Structure formats: C-alpha cells, structure tokens
Amino acid sequence: MKPIALSIKGLHSFREEQTIDFEGLSGAGVFGIFGPTGSGKSSILDAMTLALYGKVERAANNTHGILNHAEDTLSVSFTFALQTNHQISYKVERVFKRTDEMKVKTALCRFIEIKDEHTVLADKASEVNKRVEELLGLTIDDFTRAVVLPQGKFAEFLSLKGAERRHMLQRLFNLEQYGDRLVKKLRRQAQEANARKNEMLAEQSGLGEASSEAVEQAEKVLEQAEARLEAMRKNRDQAKERFTEHQEIWNVQKEKSTYEEEEKRLAEEQPHIDSMQKRLLEAETAAALKPYADRYAEAIQHEEQAEKEQTLAQKDLADRTAFFQQKHEEYEAWRQHKSEKEPELLAKQEQLSRLQEIEIKLSEAKQEEERKKADLRQKEEALQSVMNELETVTDRLTRGQNRQTELKQQLKSLQVTSDERKSCQQAAEMALRIRQTEEQIKKEKKRSEELNLVLQKMNEEKNTLVQKTEAEENNIIQAYEAVQTVYHLVCETERSLTRMTEEARKSQHTLHLQREKARVALLTKELAQKLTAGKPCPVCGSTDHDPSASVHETYEADSHLEEDIKRTDVLLTEAAALSQEILSAKIMLEEQSARFIEQCPFLQTIQAQNLEAAASFEHQPVYEAFETAKFEWKRIKQDILSVKTRMAQMIGAYQESLKKAEQLNEKIGFEKREADRIESIISELQSSMDSSLNMFKEAFQNQSVDEAEKWQQAIEEKDRAAEECEKRIEKSIAFLAEHEAQKEKLRESGHRLEREKLELHYAAERIKSVIADYEHELGDYAKGDSIQIKLRSVQQDLKLLKEKEQSLYEELQSAQMKLNQAKSRASASELTLQEAKGRLEKAKAAWLEHTKNTSITRTEEVEQSLIPADELEKMKTGIDQFMDKLKQNAANLKRVAEILAGRALSESEWNETVAALQEAEDAFGAAIEEKGAAAKALAVIRDHHKRFNEIEAELKKWQMHIDRLDKLQAVFKGNTFVEFLAEEQLESVARDASARLSMLTRQRYAIEVDSEGGFVMRDDANGGVRRPVSSLSGGETFLTSLSLALALSAQIQLRGEYPLQFFFLDEGFGTLDQDLLDTVVTALEKLQSDNLAVGVISHVQELRARLPKKLIVHPAEPSGRGTRVSLELM
C-alpha cells in the first residue's frame, strides 16, 4: 500500500483545502512533517484514518468536535495504490456537515477504483468501510498500531495482551484462512461425506435380492425359455410354407374373377366410343378450315374501313387549304403596316430617353440641396450647444478650485501626532484584551456548568446500564445452559438412531433370505404339478417323478413377508434422511455455541449438566422405536428453534448494552477531560486578566478601561474624517484636471464647427445654380405627364408591332404544316384502299378452294363445328384408354389361365390355412416374450449384483475418508493451529525487531517472546537479564516500539498479497538524546533500500535539519486563516 495524495478541508485547524503530494514527498525514503506545537501535524494522520475508516480515534465518539469551529463542512480525500503485478490505484472521498456545535453527519462518501477510467465501487458509508477493510485486511485498531501511529498509540502493540496480539497478527498476516475457514471447510466435507454414505446405504437397501444363487437360478430359467423358443420357431416355419402355396392360388383366382367382370363392362361401353369417334372427325375438319375463314372475314372488314378513311381524308384536305390562304393574307397586311409606323416611333423614343436622363439629374440635385440645408442647420445647433456647455464647464471649474482650498485647510486641523496615537493604541489594545478575557471567562464558566449537568445525567445512565448488563448476563447463562442441554439430547438421539438403524439392516437381510427361500419352494411346487409320468423333467431330464419330494419341499409363502420388507426399506430410507437432519442440527448447534462463546467469553466456564438417562425408545421394537424417535425429534427441533432464537435475541440485546456502555464511558471520559480542561482554561484566563489590569493601571494612571476605549474611538473618528478629506482632495484633483481638459476640448470643437458651417453654405449655393440649368433644358416637357410615362407609352407601341408580326407569322407556319399533313393523309388513305381490295380477292379465292370437297359452305359453320382444345384432347384420351383396356384385359385373362393350370382352392380350405399360421405365430411370439422376460430378469439381477459389490467397495473408501476427516476436525478444533502460526509469525517479527533494537542501542538491548506470547526485554549489557517491558524508560520504550513497528511494517502483506510501502510516527523523538537521535535517523534513512517510506512527525529542530524532504505545517492565524502545508527540499 503506497500513499499518493491526501486532501484536507475543515478538519480541526485546517480551513482552506490543503493537498499533500506523498509521491514527491516520499521519494527519498524518509521524510518529515514539521511545525510548531498545535499547528495541525497530527491532524494529517487523523485525516488519513477519517478518509479510510470514517473515524478519528482521539475524538469523542470518533467524530465529535473534529469540524473547524468556523466551517460548516469537512472534506477529506485519500488516494493510495496497491502494488501487485500491475499497480491499481484507489481513492476514498468523505464529506461531513455540521449538525450542532460538536456533532457532524456524513454528506458524501465514495470509494473509487482508478484504472483507465474511474469506477465507483461503493457510495454509502457502511459499504465504503466494509470495502476498505476487505481490501486492506486491517481494522482501524490494526492500522493505528502497525501502519499509522498517532500520539498515544505508539507503544500500544508492545503492551498488548497475548490473545489480543495474536488476533491482530491473524488479520495483519491473513491467517484467518487457517482458522475458522479451514474448520468450516472440513466440517462441510465431513457433512457431504456422511450424506454420500447414507445415500449409498439407501441405494444398497433398495437393490433387493442380488446374491450369486439368484443369478444362477435366473440363468437356468433363461435356458428353458430358449429351448421352447426353438421348438415354436420350427412349427411356425412349416405353417408359413403351406400358407405361401395356398395364398398364391387364392390370389390368382380372385384376379381372374376381376378380369372377367371388366370384359363385360367394356362390351357395354363400345357404342358410346363409336359416336365419339365421328364427332372427333368433324371437329378436326373445322379446325383445318378455320385459318382461311378468319382471313376471309378479316379482309372484308379491312376493305370497308379503308373506304371510310379515304372519304374523311379528302374532306380534311379541302378545309386546311382554305385556312392557309386566309392566314397568308393577314400576315402580309400587318407587315406593310409595321414598315410605315416603326421609324416614327423609334425617333420619338430616342428624344424622350435623353430628356429622362436630365430629369433624373435634376431630382438628384434637388435632394442634395435639401441635405446640405439640413447639415447646415445641424452645425448651427451643435455650435450653440458647444458654447452653452463651455460656459457650464468654466463655472464648475471655478467652484471646484474654491472647494479644494477649503478641504486642505480642514485636513490640516484633523491631523493627530504620532506620540498621541501610539499611547492611545497601546491603551486600546490592553483594554481590548481585558474585555476579550472577561467574555471568554463568562463563556467558559457557562460551558463548565453545562458539562457538570451532562456528567451527572451520564453517571446516572451508566449505573442503570450496569445493572441491566448484569441481569442480561445471567439470562444468557441460563439460555446457554438450555442450548447445551438440547445439544446433549441431539447427541443421544443420534446414537440411539444409529443403533436402531443397525438392527433394521439386520432385520432387512433376514427378510430377504426368507423371501428367496419361499420363492424357490413355490417354483418347485409349480414345476412338480406340471410333470407327467414317463416324460422327462425339463430341469433335470429324469422320467421318474416322486410327488412326495415336491410336496415335502414346498413352503407356503408368508403373505406378510413382502409387506415387512417394504416397511423395512421405507424405515431405512427415512432413518437415513433423519440421520442427516440430526447431523446438520448437531453441526449447527456446535457452530452456534462457538459463536456464542466468541460473542460472550464468560460462557467458556459454563458447562451443562450431563444427561443420565438415554433416550426412552432404546428397548422398543424397531418400528415402534423409529416412530418414537421421529416424535422425539420433532419435539427437539422445536426446542432447538426456541433456544436458538432466544439466545440470539439475548446476545443481541447484551451486545447492544455493552456497546452503549462503551460509548457512554467514552463520552464520560471525554466530558470529564473537557471539564478539567475548561477549569484549567478559566484559571489561566483569570490570572491573565488580573495581570493585564495591573499593567494598565501602571501605564495609564489617569484613565479607566472605558475611557481608553473612548479615547481610541475619538482618534479613530479624526482618522476617518482625515481619510475622508484626503479622499475628497484626491477626487477634486482628478475633477479639476478633467474639467480643464474638457474646457479646452470644447473650445476646439467650436472653432471646427464654425469652419464646417461656412463650407456647407458655399456648397448649397453651387447646387442651386446647377438646378436652374437643368430646368431650362427641360422647358415645356416638365409640364403635364412625366417624361417617363411618355417614354413607356412609345416603347409599348413598338413592342406591340413586333409581337403581332411574330404571332401572325407563327400562325401562318402552323397552317402550312397542317396543310402538308392533310395532303399526306389523303395520299395514304387512297393507297390503303387499293391494298385492302387486293387482299379481299385473294382471301375469297383461298376459301373457295379449300371448302369445295367438304360439307361446309359458310364461314359461320366452321365456328359451330369446332370443339375446345381441352375437350378435344379429353375425347382422344378417352378413346385411346378404352382401346388399351380392351387389349390389356384380354392379355390378363390369358396369363391367369396359364398360372392356374387347372388348380383350384375353396374358401373353407383357405380359412383353415390362415388360422393355422396365426396359431403358430402366436405361440412363437409368446415364446419370444418368455425368453425376453427371462433375459431381462437375468440382466437386472446381474446389474443389481454388480452394483451391490460396487457400493460395498465405495462404502469402505468413504468410511476411510470420513475417519480421516474426523481426525482432522479433532486436530483443528478450536484455534490451536492459527495460534501456532500467529506465534511463529510473532517470533519472526520479534527476531527482526530485536536485530533493529540491538543496532539502535549499540548491542545493549534485545527483545524476546515469553511462553505466554508477551514481550520481555533482554539486557545484554547486564549479563542477559530479562526485564518486563513495563520497566522501560520513555526513551527505551520509544526505541523498542520503533523497532517492533519497523519489523512489523516490513513483513506485512495486506490480504496476503499487497506489500505495505509506508509507515508514520507521531511521537517519541523528544525523549532521545542527540546520539540516539542520530542513530535512529541513520537507521530510518537506510529503510529506503527496503522499499518502505517512513514519515516522521515532530517539532525537534535537530531532526528537521537531518531530513532532505520535509512537509512544513504552518499554524492557523488569528485573522481566521487555517493551517497550511508546504514542501521544503534540502
């Protein structure tokens, strides 16, 4: 863990935000934080713990009184890095707001991971505290004992008791993984192993009979079934051969009957087919003539259409010729009119255009004349305004000079001598200090009275809380005894259930043997009943059967045997589940008891009374005992739930009371210290005020404190009046200079305006002469309509002449084009008519030629004789199919006659053959099923036999695994292993610290660990005598604690993976002489090579002179400015 930056604002004496750059500060390995006493050096460490854990250890209630009295908000921000393979940075931000004079509340809290971008990991105070402790693996107590050592905490690790020191080392060196976590892991594995064992026992019980004798019996049954199957197969094959022969004759006979019926049906259909063939011939003839009939009818239609079109074209040609002649005459007449009118209009247009230009110039000249007159009037007005303003400025300047003279005389009368001012100032300062001291004494006395009332209430509350805590301890002891009693009941129930389960397994084995013996006897009896005298036995092959033997060996199956086996199987399954449930409850009670002892250490001495009587169902029959056990277990479960809930509630209330008592003690201690401090302040203030009054009387015998204040006020009034005079004189100097400059500027403006006025007058006269010349040129044209209107009229007449000519020309061209089109259509229609007549003659000749040998004479008959193509195709297909069927049926009759060759089969003979085959097939199928059932039964028994053996082997392995886990649980019970590791780690730290201490004390002292885990000193200078650490002097305690802290910091790995890269000291250097101080600083300077930065907080000047990099803490100022920090390099 490496610090990067720390920002502080509003904490203790800090007001403005101050940022400390640790990266630049810790580059040399060792750096110092220096400043006078009370400047705020220790507040830097407070800011670090406040940012990380939200607490200031030396503050009451961890946060009371930490906010600067002149601020309403406090903010801290700490950025640090954790170095693994690659460095990851984190930033913790906290902002607090004031709630009253002492208390603050969290306003903002964030924990940020800094990589390529910032990621907020937590934004609530509790979550941030949890994430910081998880990341670092240190509580605030660990942090202030091993990393950041504030005032009063330096020697705490040295004096910690053994158990508390071991717990701290467990967290510092991440030893929890070898303690509770390892025990829980072993317990979980043991629970899983027992569950697996119970599952296998239940599975083994459910397999039923799986002995080797059962396998052999099943194999014999399978051999008998195979022999029967072979006999049935031969019988079925013979029946199949006879069936195949009769089936062929029967099927051919049925086929012949079908062909004879088909022959009769075809003979009845023959007349209809003949009619269809005649109609088909007529349709084919009409189809051949249709193209000629269509061409003939089309030619007649085209000839009629061509005659109509030719008539219309001739009429259109005559109309277009008359229209063209009319347009040609109109165009020629307008051309003649244009040639006469156009020259006259063009001459008039040119004259009007020149006069229009003159008219525009005249208008512009008149506008310019008006502008010049307006400018002239403006200049005259501006000149008058400047002259008026010049008169006003001159008057103000005179009055200002007179007032300045008066102010200078007044200032001279208000001046105070330096001696008078000095005496007055001394008297006022002494009077102010006396008044301030009086007010402070009143304020502190009031605070003292309020604190005494608060302390009285707190002591009353403390007495009540002590009584409540003692009562809660007694209740917890009673509840814990109840928990232990329930635990013993659970253990007794578990042992009884184990014994009952063993008895049930024995009973199950006996029942299975009885069932197998009864099944063999029953099979023997059934086989003996089926034997016939003189025939061989299918099992042994003997022909001599002794009925007495089967009767003698037959056993009647017990009707209750199967029911007893099922009951036993169910009981074992339920017993396994109940055993698992009891084991879980037992483990849960053990864990709960451990937690209760951890939360309430006084419970370690409490032991529950042993139960003398065992469970009441031990000597009952198995089934009754199991029902009793289930009933008892339900009652015990209720007891477990009851005592667990009751115990948890009591411990919660007890811990809450302890927490309240601890908080109350802290508050009482703080308030007592605060009351003592206030009394001391009041005494000091009273002494200071008496001394100040005596000094005032000696210095100013003729004045009282009140008169001194009034004297100071009088001088201050004179000073304020003189200051006001000086300000007014300064303003008057600027005022007079400004008005003098303004007066000169106004004079220049008046001269300039006079010149501009004359220039405008002359320009207006010149423009008036130009206007007269333009009006003379226009003459009479300026009267009546404007020249622009006359010019627009002439231009409109010229435009009309051209547009009308163009329009008539376009109409003439259009008429010409339409005339040409009409001529083309007339010629084309004449040609089309001649061609239509020729085609008609050819089509008529072709029609007559092709119909002369047919019965069709008119084109209409062709359409009447035609048949649609799909219907025609259907008729052809029907005729072809009929002919094919006729031929095929004759061939089939011939073929079946050859196959039968005179053979015949009656229906009764065929039915007998079918029945015989079915009977043979049924017998063969029954034999197959019988063999399959026997084979399946054999396979099931073999699988069960194999699985039974596998489970037996696995049970042995699991039992060995459970035994090993039980041994490990016994070894790791309690925290002995973790304590061993912590002691080893402590020995390592002590060896390293002893080497450092030996160097610091010139081989005089060494440190060792005693048998109880505490530290003792070895005085090598006095023959190795051991001394308790409590006998050390202040300087010796500092050196020993420093050695331990450096050794601990060098070995700490946060969460077992992050190296600790910094260490802070905040006391102790003042107890060292010059030689020891040099030795300590030299040792600290050597730490740079160990990748460990050490920060030293001190006010010792000799230490400040030795360190190359220093952070200087400047104390707060009376003006209100807060503590500031600055970096100083050697």
Curated annotation (Swiss-Prot):
GO cellular component: cytoplasm; DNA repair complex; nucleoid
Gene: sbcC
GO biological process, alphabetically ordered: DNA recombination; DNA repair; DNA replication
Localization terms from the record: Cytoplasm, Nucleoid
Description of how the protein assembles with itself and partners: Heterodimer of SbcC and SbcD.
Record-linked InterPro entries: P-loop_NTPase (IPR027417), SMC_SbcC-like_nuclease (IPR053614)
Keyword Acetylation tagged: no
Gene3D superfamilies linked to this entry: P-loop containing nucleotide triphosphate hydrolases
A Pfam cross-reference name: SbcC_Walker_B
Coiled-coil blocks: 115-135, 179-270, 344-530, 652-904, 940-1004
Protein name according to UniProt: Nuclease SbcCD subunit C
UniProt entry keywords in alphabetical sequence: ATP-binding, Coiled coil, Cytoplasm, DNA recombination, DNA replication, Endonuclease, Exonuclease, Hydrolase, Nuclease, Nucleotide-binding
Family: Belongs to the SMC family. SbcC subfamily.
Gene Ontology MF terms: ATP binding; DNA exonuclease activity; endonuclease activity
Function: SbcCD cleaves DNA hairpin structures. These structures can inhibit DNA replication and are intermediates in certain DNA recombination reactions. The complex acts as a 3'->5' double strand exonuclease that can open hairpins. It also has a 5' single-strand endonuclease activity.
SUPFAM superfamilies: P-loop containing nucleoside triphosphate hydrolases (SSF52540)
Organism per entry: Bacillus subtilis (strain 168)
Binding site for ATP: 35-42
